Swiss-Prot record:
Keywords: Chloroplast, Cytochrome c-type biogenesis, Membrane, Plastid, Thylakoid, Transmembrane, Transmembrane helix. Belongs to the CcmF/CycK/Ccl1/NrfE/CcsA family. The keyword Plastid applies. Its main location: plastid. InterPro entries: Cyt_c_assembly, Cyt_c_biogenesis_CcsA, Cyt_c_biogenesis_CcsA/CcmC. This is Cytochrome c biogenesis protein CcsA.
Amino acid sequence: MIFITLEHILAHISFSLISVVTLAYWGTLVHQIEGLSSSGGKGMIVTFVCTTGLLITRWLYSGHLPLSNLYESFMFLSWSSSVIHIILEVRSQKDRGLGAITAPSTMLTHGFATSGLPKEMQQSAMLVPALQSHWLMMHVSMILLSYATLLCGSLSSIAFLIITFRRNRRILSLLSARDNSFIWPFPSRNNLYLHEQEKSDLQNTFYLSFTNHRKCKLTQQLDYWSYRVIGLGFLLLTIGILSGAVWANEAWGSRWSWDPKETWALITWIIFAIYLHTRVNKGWQDENPAIIASLGSFIVWICYLGVDLLGIGLHSYGWLI
């Protein structure tokens, strides 16, 4: 009873903290307050500690690694996102753009686990005999870590596409406005108005140049880290699939059975393999790999939740709805 109460307290504290942290990172994108960004980083560390304590507490009273149902997998996914956030904070020298992506991911997965799932699915239960294996920790943890990593990299690619599209559209609209302007050679009231319009366009050009420099730097950082994070996620997914094949061979005598989860895991692996191939292909650069990564985020969610929506297969946690 004490462990269950402690788990609920840690769940509420961690969700409250990550909600405040998300608002802090979004605020830094608008106002660029350095202290706010630093507070967000510290808040994420406290969130990580609370979520770690929650998982350890559940491990102690359940007697097994908390990866046996949908609630536990979502909490582990949220924990993984916080780990990725902290690593990126250190490696990217506290870049605000990345924090504004990883913090909401942590908040949404945590919130869905605690508030979106029915209480029956949040209860801990004994493991079925097939799951009572040392491969549970290796296989499931690697798969969930890969999901969190691939989603983080894919969301960075989506943000890269959005910023690039809006920047290009603004440049085209300004150039179109300037090309359509015509200065009448004789002095008139309209002529003075057009000169004022040209002056305004010039001011907009300077402002656009400044903002484009910031956006260009941000898109470069998003593209840089998206590539590296997805590369790590691809490696983790490969390890997870291989360890699952070994476990399946020990449990059922078959390494691959084309279970729905296995099939979608293979599709996910192929999509991100194509993404990594396009990154080394000079003919496919800029937005093209980002589009593939964006598709990959959709595929990851199908792989993760699709089986539960169908309610079939050996990997199903049961009906989600």
